[in-house]
Amino acid sequence: YSNSEDSAGGGTPFHSYNVKSISASSSLKEEQYGQDVVYAPINLFRAFEIGCRCHPYWWNYSHIPWVEGAKGYGINETISVEFKNQIYGFSILNGYADIQNMKLFKENSRVKKLKVEDLTNKLEYTMNFEDKVYFNYLELSKPSKSIKLTILEVYKGTKYQDTCISALIENTRA
Protein backbone atom coordinates (compact mmCIF):
# COMPACT_ATOMS: atom_id res chain seq x y z
CA TYR A 1 0.00 0.00 0.00
CA SER A 2 1.15 3.50 -0.73
CA ASN A 3 -0.81 6.63 0.14
CA SER A 4 -1.51 7.35 -3.54
CA GLU A 5 -3.72 4.27 -3.79
CA ASP A 6 -6.44 2.87 -1.59
CA SER A 7 -6.50 -0.77 -2.62
CA ALA A 8 -8.83 -1.93 0.14
CA GLY A 9 -11.53 0.63 -0.61
CA GLY A 10 -13.71 2.39 1.92
CA GLY A 11 -12.38 5.94 1.57
CA THR A 12 -9.49 7.62 3.31
CA PRO A 13 -8.42 6.05 6.59
CA PHE A 14 -8.44 8.47 9.55
CA HIS A 15 -4.78 8.22 10.54
CA SER A 16 -3.16 7.41 7.19
CA TYR A 17 -2.53 11.02 6.15
CA ASN A 18 1.00 10.53 7.54
CA VAL A 19 1.61 7.05 6.07
CA LYS A 20 3.89 7.09 3.04
CA SER A 21 3.87 3.30 2.64
CA ILE A 22 3.01 0.18 4.61
CA SER A 23 3.67 -3.49 3.95
CA ALA A 24 3.49 -6.82 5.75
CA SER A 25 5.29 -10.11 5.28
CA SER A 26 1.84 -11.72 4.92
CA SER A 27 -1.87 -10.92 5.20
CA LEU A 28 -4.78 -13.31 5.62
CA LYS A 29 -7.13 -13.57 2.63
CA GLU A 30 -10.46 -15.36 2.89
CA GLU A 31 -13.91 -15.44 1.34
CA GLN A 32 -16.92 -14.22 3.32
CA TYR A 33 -20.43 -14.21 1.86
CA GLY A 34 -19.00 -14.60 -1.67
CA GLN A 35 -16.61 -11.65 -1.27
CA ASP A 36 -12.82 -11.75 -0.97
CA VAL A 37 -11.65 -10.18 2.30
CA VAL A 38 -8.03 -9.15 2.78
CA TYR A 39 -6.87 -8.35 6.30
CA ALA A 40 -4.26 -5.91 4.96
CA PRO A 41 -1.79 -3.85 7.01
CA ILE A 42 -3.44 -0.56 5.98
CA ASN A 43 -6.37 -1.68 8.16
CA LEU A 44 -4.24 -0.64 11.16
CA PHE A 45 -5.05 2.96 10.21
CA ARG A 46 -8.81 2.45 9.62
CA ALA A 47 -10.03 1.78 13.16
CA PHE A 48 -11.35 5.32 13.62
CA GLU A 49 -13.42 7.69 11.50
CA ILE A 50 -13.31 11.47 11.43
CA GLY A 51 -16.02 12.97 13.61
CA CYS A 52 -17.11 16.48 14.48
CA ARG A 53 -15.57 19.26 16.58
CA CYS A 54 -16.87 17.92 19.90
CA HIS A 55 -16.02 14.28 19.06
CA PRO A 56 -13.03 14.43 16.70
CA TYR A 57 -13.08 10.70 15.95
CA TRP A 58 -15.04 7.56 16.72
CA TRP A 59 -14.75 3.81 16.26
CA ASN A 60 -15.26 2.57 12.70
CA TYR A 61 -17.73 -0.31 13.16
CA SER A 62 -16.88 -1.80 9.75
CA HIS A 63 -13.16 -1.90 10.59
CA ILE A 64 -11.23 -5.17 10.34
CA PRO A 65 -7.71 -5.69 11.71
CA TRP A 66 -4.46 -6.68 10.06
CA VAL A 67 -4.20 -10.47 10.32
CA GLU A 68 -1.01 -12.28 9.38
CA GLY A 69 -1.46 -14.93 6.71
CA ALA A 70 1.40 -17.31 7.52
CA LYS A 71 0.95 -20.91 8.56
CA GLY A 72 0.84 -21.26 12.34
CA TYR A 73 0.78 -18.38 14.81
CA GLY A 74 2.66 -15.77 12.78
CA ILE A 75 5.90 -15.79 14.75
CA ASN A 76 8.46 -13.59 12.92
CA GLU A 77 5.81 -12.04 10.65
CA THR A 78 6.46 -8.33 10.10
CA ILE A 79 4.81 -4.98 9.36
CA SER A 80 6.90 -2.11 7.96
CA VAL A 81 5.63 1.48 7.97
CA GLU A 82 7.23 4.53 6.42
CA PHE A 83 5.80 7.89 7.50
CA LYS A 84 5.80 11.21 5.61
CA ASN A 85 6.53 13.15 8.81
CA GLN A 86 8.50 12.00 11.82
CA ILE A 87 6.77 10.28 14.72
CA TYR A 88 7.68 10.38 18.40
CA GLY A 89 5.88 7.21 19.40
CA PHE A 90 2.79 5.17 18.67
CA SER A 91 0.00 3.15 20.27
CA ILE A 92 -1.05 -0.35 19.25
CA LEU A 93 -4.49 -1.87 19.79
CA ASN A 94 -3.63 -5.56 19.98
CA GLY A 95 -5.75 -8.51 18.88
CA TYR A 96 -9.06 -8.58 17.02
CA ALA A 97 -10.87 -5.69 18.73
CA ASP A 98 -14.51 -5.65 17.62
CA ILE A 99 -17.03 -3.82 19.80
CA GLN A 100 -19.91 -5.76 18.22
CA ASN A 101 -18.31 -9.21 18.50
CA MET A 102 -15.99 -9.21 21.52
CA LYS A 103 -15.40 -12.97 21.49
CA LEU A 104 -13.15 -12.51 18.42
CA PHE A 105 -10.43 -11.12 20.72
CA LYS A 106 -9.90 -14.44 22.54
CA GLU A 107 -10.79 -16.65 19.56
CA ASN A 108 -7.89 -15.21 17.51
CA SER A 109 -4.25 -15.10 18.56
CA ARG A 110 -2.83 -11.86 19.98
CA VAL A 111 0.70 -10.47 20.21
CA LYS A 112 2.42 -11.12 23.53
CA LYS A 113 5.85 -9.73 22.60
CA LEU A 114 6.71 -7.46 19.67
CA LYS A 115 10.11 -6.32 18.42
CA VAL A 116 10.08 -2.71 17.19
CA GLU A 117 12.90 -1.56 14.94
CA ASP A 118 13.37 2.16 14.39
CA LEU A 119 14.87 1.96 10.90
CA THR A 120 15.66 5.70 10.79
CA ASN A 121 17.90 5.69 13.87
CA LYS A 122 18.90 2.00 13.92
CA LEU A 123 17.37 1.49 17.39
CA GLU A 124 15.44 -1.49 18.73
CA TYR A 125 12.67 -1.77 21.33
CA THR A 126 10.53 -4.54 22.77
CA MET A 127 6.82 -4.14 23.48
CA ASN A 128 5.14 -6.57 25.86
CA PHE A 129 1.35 -6.84 25.85
CA GLU A 130 -1.08 -7.91 28.54
CA ASP A 131 -3.81 -10.23 27.29
CA LYS A 132 -6.60 -7.65 27.26
CA VAL A 133 -8.03 -5.00 24.93
CA TYR A 134 -6.15 -1.73 25.45
CA PHE A 135 -3.84 0.72 23.68
CA ASN A 136 -0.17 0.01 24.45
CA TYR A 137 2.02 3.10 23.88
CA LEU A 138 5.71 3.12 22.96
CA GLU A 139 7.64 6.39 23.17
CA LEU A 140 10.62 6.46 20.82
CA SER A 141 13.90 7.85 22.19
CA LYS A 142 14.41 9.78 18.89
CA PRO A 143 11.93 10.89 16.22
CA SER A 144 11.62 8.41 13.35
CA LYS A 145 10.09 8.12 9.89
CA SER A 146 10.33 4.35 9.51
CA ILE A 147 9.51 1.41 11.79
CA LYS A 148 9.35 -2.36 11.48
CA LEU A 149 7.30 -4.56 13.83
CA THR A 150 8.09 -8.26 14.27
CA ILE A 151 5.90 -10.74 16.17
CA LEU A 152 8.07 -12.60 18.70
CA GLU A 153 5.49 -14.30 20.96
CA VAL A 154 1.71 -14.68 20.96
CA TYR A 155 -1.23 -15.53 23.18
CA LYS A 156 -2.83 -18.45 21.36
CA GLY A 157 -6.41 -18.05 20.18
CA THR A 158 -9.08 -20.43 21.45
CA LYS A 159 -10.36 -21.03 17.90
CA TYR A 160 -7.91 -19.60 15.34
CA GLN A 161 -4.12 -19.51 15.05
CA ASP A 162 -4.22 -16.22 13.10
CA THR A 163 -2.54 -13.35 15.00
CA CYS A 164 -4.27 -9.97 14.75
CA ILE A 165 -3.46 -6.31 15.42
CA SER A 166 -6.40 -3.89 15.22
CA ALA A 167 -4.87 -0.41 15.15
CA LEU A 168 -1.70 1.66 15.14
CA ILE A 169 -1.95 5.34 16.03
CA GLU A 170 1.19 7.41 15.60
CA ASN A 171 2.15 10.38 17.76
CA THR A 172 3.42 13.20 15.54
CA ARG A 173 3.99 15.71 18.37
CA ALA A 174 6.98 15.95 20.70
Describe each model-derived feature in a short phrase.
Residues 14, 45-48, 83, 90, ...:
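Phenylalanine-focused residue identity feature
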Residues 83-86, 156:
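Generic detector of short alpha-helix boundary/capping microenvironments
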Residues 87-95, 99:
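Mid-length scaffold segments of soluble, non-membrane domains
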Residues 20, 88-89, 112, 166:
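A short, local hydrophobic-aromatic micro-motif
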